[in-house]
Each structure stands twice: as C-alpha cells, then as structure tokens.
Amino acid sequence: MEWGSVALLGFSAINTINILRQSQLSLTERLIWIFYTIFFVIFIAEEISWGERLHGYGIDSIKAINTQGETNLHNIGAFQLKGLLHLGWAALGLLLGLGSWIIKDSPLLPDKKLSLYFLIPAIWYISFEFCRDGGSCPITVANHQEIYEFLIAIGLFLHTRLWRHRKTILNHSKTI
C-alpha cells in the first residue's frame, strides 16, 4: 500500500508540473502549485526513506533514533512517542478536508467532493491519539496507518487531477 501512495504522489507531482506549465496562472496560483510540487517530492522521499529502500544506503545517526531503523524523519522516536506525527496528519486532514467549505475555488484546497479522503484519516488519527492516551486502544497504528496515508494520497492525486483538467479546459476554451 505504501508504494501505491508513492505512485499516486508521483502522479500528483506530474500533475502539478503540468499545471505550472500553463501560462495563465496568477502569481498566487503559481506559488501554490510550486508549494504542492515541493511537498509531493518531500513526501515521496520520506515514504521511500530518501532512497534507502532502493539503494540500501542510509544515515546511521538517523537510523539509530528511528523506530523502524530507517533513514527518514517521520519515524523518529520523539515524533512517534509524543503523537506529533499523528496530530500533524490530523491537522493536514482537517485543513484539506474542511478548507474548501470556508475558502471556495482555491487551488490550495481540494474541492468539497474530496473532503472524505482527508476527513476520515483526520478523525482516525485524532481518535487513535485519544484512545492511546487513555490506555485502552484496541487498534495499533502499524496495522492501519498505511490505509489512511493512502486515502490522503488518493485525495491529493484527485485534487491535482481536477485542477489540471480545469486549467486544460480553460486554456482550450480561450484559444477557440
């Protein structure tokens, strides 16, 4: 499932690059899509442990404090133990899932019809943290986290796909 997320994020990055090639973008739109492109590249690099899974080389000092012994930042023990990673995922899910209900038609925020791709993971991460803090959690993060990361990746791919399609249609109608 993790490689599926990586593939969707890769396609999302390709979509953002194609959106950036459109000449009619405002400066604000261009900055938003540059931000998304950088976000996708970092997200992909973190998911594949900055290539360690592909070439086998890692940074020992990071691997030593990493809960999975990998070269990535998101599995560093301090982030995992304090719930910071989960709360970050929850905040991202809430922002992307609810943002378009407040700010309409912004390339920064996915369309309302994509809300559940972000809100379901946000609710799960928040619930997991409350459950874990209470000490009576029947679920484990390892068994479920990839599913929710995958949902977010699907939502981000669909968001970039919709905007890419929208910009292509706008360009085509202006040339007719």
Show where each model-derived region lies.
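Non-cytosolic membrane-interface motifs at loop->transmembrane helix junctions
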Residues: M1-W3, C137-E149
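A generic, lipid-embedded transmembrane alpha helix
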Residues: L8-A13, I34-I48
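Aromatic-anchored segments of alpha-helical transmembrane domains
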Residues: F39-E46, I120-D133
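Transmembrane alpha-helix/helix-exit interface in multi-pass inner-membrane proteins
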Residues: V41-S61
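Hydrophobic alpha-helical transmembrane segments
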Residues: E70-G93
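Juxtamembrane "helix-exit" motif on the non-cytosolic side of transmembrane helices
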Residues: W101-K104, S127-T140
